[in-house]
């Protein structure tokens, strides 16, 4: 299974800022590393998030909750999570406004990984 690296997430963030605007920059490297590590987190020797959808949800939540970037955290989180889904062979379909609204819902409602994973599953197509 493919997971995202620190370098890939930094590239995604740079792309987001370049194409949609905002202030570039990393606010806290440790928080970003923590968000990225969440996709491969183990508890008692077992993967906490075994499926690619759960890993995607974990990285989305981690970036949104930890705010490691100066700007563009929600946009970067969603693109990183959806990139992870695509890299692992899944097809995600949603309108841009749905994705934006859901990112805000995660940020304001502090949705957990299972809730984010459920939303992602509803938008997968064969």
Model-identified regions with their sequence ranges:
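FIC/Doc superfamily catalytic core
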Residues: 1-126
């Amino acid at each position: 299974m493919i997971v995202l690296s620190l370098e890939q997430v930094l590239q995604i963030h740079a792309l987001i800022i370049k194409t949609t605007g905002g202030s570039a920059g990393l606010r806290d490297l440790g928080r970003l590393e923590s968000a990225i590590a969440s996709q491969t987190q183990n508890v008692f020797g077992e993967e906490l998030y075994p499926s690619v959808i759960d890993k995607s949800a974990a990285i989305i939540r981690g970036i949104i909750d930890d705010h490691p970037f100066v700007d563009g955290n929600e946009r970067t989180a969603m693109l990183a999570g959806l990139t992870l889904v695509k890299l692992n062979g899944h097809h995600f379909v949603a309108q841009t406004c749905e994705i934006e609204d859901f990112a805000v819902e995660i940020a304001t409602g502090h949705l957990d990984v299972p809730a984010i994973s459920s939303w992602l599953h509803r938008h997968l197509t064969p």
